[in-house]
Each structure stands twice: as C-alpha cells, then as structure tokens.
UniProtKB/Swiss-Prot annotation:
It comes from the Viruses. InterPro entries: LEF-9. The keyword Transcription regulation applies. The keyword Disulfide bond does not apply. Belongs to the baculoviridae LEF-9 family. One of its GO terms (biological process) is viral transcription. Involved in late/very late gene activation. Keywords: Transcription, Transcription regulation. It comes from Orgyia pseudotsugata multicapsid polyhedrosis virus. This is Late expression factor 9. The gene is LEF-9.
C-alpha cells in the first residue's frame, strides 16, 4: 500500500522581518487611506495649486494657515522615511498575479518611493486607487477566473499567462523614476531620441549638453532591441511626445504607431555604465548585433532612397570602397541591397564608417514627402507599385488580394464566415507557434553557448570534445567570401 503525503507549498514573502528595515514608514491599508484622504482634502484648500510647485511647497502653503490635525505625525513619518510601505493590501487595490506557480510570491504590500519623488498627480492617483467609491472597482481576476470553466485552451492560456499582471504597470510609471514613458513619433534620424524637455531637466536637474539614454519598446522588453541613443534636446517645452530616430529599430522589431517607448537616462558624469553601453549598445562601436545590423532603414526611408537612387549612387561614387561594395550586390532587391551595403561596409571599414554612411543617406531624404492621390486610393497603383518595386513593403500578391477583398459583397456569407474562421485559427496557431519557437530559441542558445572554435576544430564544453572540423561550418558563420576576395585582390 503506497500513500502520498501532501507537501506544503513553498511560499516567499520577501519582507521577512519588517522591524529590521531602517527608516521605512509602515502603514496598514486603512491607516494609509485615512492619511491620503485628509492630505488630498488639505491640498485642495491650496490657493495656488501649481504643477511646477513641489508637493512640499504646496504643503507649506496649506499648513502655514491651518494645522495638520490628527495626521500630522503620519505625514512627518512619510516625509522622513526613505520609503513608505503599505501593508495588508486587499486585492482590489493591487491585483494578484493571475497564474500561481511554485515561485509566485504572496506579496500583499506596496513599496512607495521617497516622498521627494511624489507630486500632486501621484497623490491624486493613490487616493483614487485606495479610496475608490466602489469597493470592487477592480475585479480580482485570478479569483474570478478560477470559477469559470474556459473550454478553449488557448484563450485560457492567454488570460492566465504568467506575465499577466492586471494593474501593476500603472504604478510603474510613477515608481520607476529613472524612466519616462511617452508616445512615439518618428524622426528621420540615426541613433537619437528627442524626449520631452522637462523629462531631461527633471532627471538631471539642470541643462545637460550631451546626454545618452537606453530606449526600449514597452510591450515585451527584450534585450535585443534595447539601444543606447543620443539624446537631442527638444526646443519646444510643450511637446510631451518622444521622437525616435527611425534607424534605431533593428529590423522590424518596432512598429511605432503610438507605441510606448521607455527611456532610461544614463547617469552623468559619464560612468562605467556609460562606457559599457558605448561598447555594446552603440552602432558607432558595434554596428552588427548577432546577425542584424544595429541601424536599419524603415520602409518609408527605403522608398525615398529608391526614388532618389541617382543621388544615392552619386554619394557612393565619392567613396570608392562603398561604391565597389554597392556594385557587388547589383542584382539584389533594393531594400536588401542597402542592408548588405551597410553590413559589408562595416566589416571592411568600421562600425563608425557604416554609422556615418547611414547618417549621410538619411540626410539625402530629409525633405521628402509622400502624397497619395486618386490613383493610389482607388486604383492601388502609383506609389504602391513603387513601394513594392523598392522592396520596402508589400508585394504584388498583397495588392491583388486587397483588390479581391474590396470586391467581396456583404451578401457573400460563405466567404465572409470562412475568412473569419481562418483569421481566428491563424491567430490561435500563431500563439502556439510563439511558445514553441521561444522554447526552440532558448534550447539553441543553451547549446550554442557551449560551442567554440579552437585549433581549427569545433569544440563542445572542453578542448577534448571535438565535434567536427571547422570546414563543416556553413559559410553564413564565417566572414563573407566576397569580402575576402576584395582583400586578396
């Protein structure tokens, strides 16, 4: 007879002993709600509320005329503390993680940053969250979901994804004070961002002539698409968007229609972090990352360059080496030809040379614009045809299928329903593929990390374990042969 004993689950509660924390102010959920309520009430009495006045200034204005009442001690603790910890949070303030596994923490506290980083909007935001009129303004999804039988596996997968924090991100915009979230607009530039003027001033506390920043697109913060960019200062102080140089999207990693981009400024004066970012993240020093060029033209730029191909060739003729490389790939589609030119020029000359060439090419097209007329709108020709020919985007088949869609009548129930089913199925299968591909990529990386070349052999983990001769490597792994020919000649 075999019996299985229940094993207690492992739980982590990260603050092990609150008493050991120095200079943190602890409040229970109820205490904090009361303090917030009275603070907001008092701040509303302020005669001159002003976004640019710090919270402390506003409080001095108010409490110069009235007493802080019963919450005075609490406010002193908040101002004194290095951070404020609110404990015993109910799930309608701070949603739990949807999918629990053995590593899920049972955190029910929220750590707020130092008071100096708060502003009036932040206090209003906290008050709305903690003192919401409807007790259940946020539904505890994890509880509710577990009571619903979801027959469709994939949809359940997506709802219960272990990355699914329901509300947490709304805190992050306030708490991660080194980062600034903004909507993205495009700029025909190289490796540069132009953040809102106040975000630069607020971070550095003064005018800075030459700052640098990490930039990341928000939905899935991946390491590969993180770039180090130069920060250009915006002339207008009323512009709250971030303008991103088109070159800094490797390949098609970022579509920038209204995306969020996160900018984290690097510390000044130039520190070791700054140096490391230069070495690994800046196209001037490492133009090629894995198999991608760090700088890539987006489709609109490719289209404009294709339109001005004579000007491009005139520019390249002033650089014999670049022009020779350009002629090697004469029979390749224009968009791929640009990529190959930048890659080869980097390998033969230097990363900085490719960076500067990229910069020159963007200068050529800075005044271009695209105008669509009836020909494009009704005939799907004109600029569309040029766009396809340049290899920038789309294909003849895509235009044909668009025409076919336009011809579909509302009464063709069969066609419409088949398309709807197909699109749902492809959505679901692509979701599955993402999971499978992710696992494959991870596995390949784990294997490849242990491979290296020594004495013309490919070795795995140690020198004695030789897998094959270096001759077995496909040419993609080696220095491009047509460039070796250039050196030999």
């Amino acid at each position: 007879m075999v019996s299985f004993l229940d094993r207690p689950p492992t739980e982590f509660d990260l603050i092990l002993d609150p008493a050991k924390l120095n200079s943190a102010a602890f409040f229970s959920n109820d205490e904090f709600r009361a303090v917030l309520k009275s603070l907001i009430g008092d701040l509303k009495k302020n005669q001159r509320p002003n976004y640019f006045n710090s919270l402390v200034d506003q409080m001095i204005n108010v409490y110069a005329h009235i007493s802080a009442g019963e919450h005075a001690d609490a406010l002193v603790r908040i101002i004194d503390a290095t951070c404020v910890v609110v404990t015993n949070l109910p799930s309608n303030v701070f949603l739990k993680k949807l999918k629990t596994n053995k590593f899920t923490d049972s955190i029910d506290y929220l750590i707020l940053p130092h008071f100096i980083l708060w502003d009036y909007n932040f206090v209003v935001f906290l008050n709305n969250t903690f003192n919401s009129k409807h007790e259940n303004s946020l539904v505890d999804i994890s509880g509710a979901l577990q009571k619903i039988k979801l027959t469709h596996g994939v949809i359940k997968d997506q709802l219960q994804s272990k990355n699914g924090y329901a509300v947490q991100y709304s805190y992050s915009t306030f708490l991660n004070t080194a980062s600034f979230y903004a909507n993205v607009q495009c700029l025909n530039g190289v490796n540069e961002v132009m953040p809102p003027l106040h975000s630069v001033r607020r971070y550095f506390g003064r005018d800075v002539p030459h700052a640098r920043a990490w930039t990341t697109r928000h939905p899935n913060i991946s390491q590969l698409s993180t770039q180090v960019s130069d920060v250009r200062v915006n002339d207008r102080d009323t512009d709250w968007n971030v303008k991103v140089g088109l070159g800094i999207f490797p390949g098609a990693n970022t579509d920038c229609d209204g995306d969020k981009k996160i900018i984290t400024y690097l510390p000044r004066p130039n520190s070791l972090i700054d140096l490391e970012c230069l070495l690994y993240g800046d196209p001037r020093y490492s133009f090629i990352c894995f198999d991608k060029n760090r700088l890539t033209f987006v489709s609109q730029q490719i289209f404009y360059l294709h339109k001005n191909v004579e000007a491009v060739e005139r520019l390249l003729k002033t650089m014999p080496l670049a022009f020779a490389l350009w002629r090697i790939h004469a029979n390749v589609k224009f968009s791929a030809r640009l990529e190959l030119l930048l890659r080869d020029f980097c390998l033969v000359a230097s990363s900085n040379a490719s960076y500067l060439l990229f910069k020159q090419l963007t200068e050529l097209i800075k005044d271009e614009e695209m105008v669509c007329a009836d020909e494009e709108l009704f005939g799907l020709s004109g600029q569309f045809t040029d766009m396809v020919n340049s290899g920038a985007k789309g294909s003849a088949a895509l235009i044909e299928s668009t025409r076919q869609y336009a011809r579909t009548r509302a009464t063709d129930i069969d066609i419409v329903s088949t398309r709807a089913t197909t699109s749902l199925n492809s959505y679901i299968s692509s979701h599955n593929k993402v999971q499978v591909c992710g696992a494959d990529i991870y596995h390949n990386t784990a294997v490849l990390q242990n491979l290296y070349i020594k004495n013309n052999y490919i070795c795995y983990k140690n020198d004695d374990r030789r897998i094959a001769s270096i001759c077995a490597l496909p040419s993609e792994y080696l220095f491009p042969e047509h460039l070796l020919d250039l050196f030999i000649e």
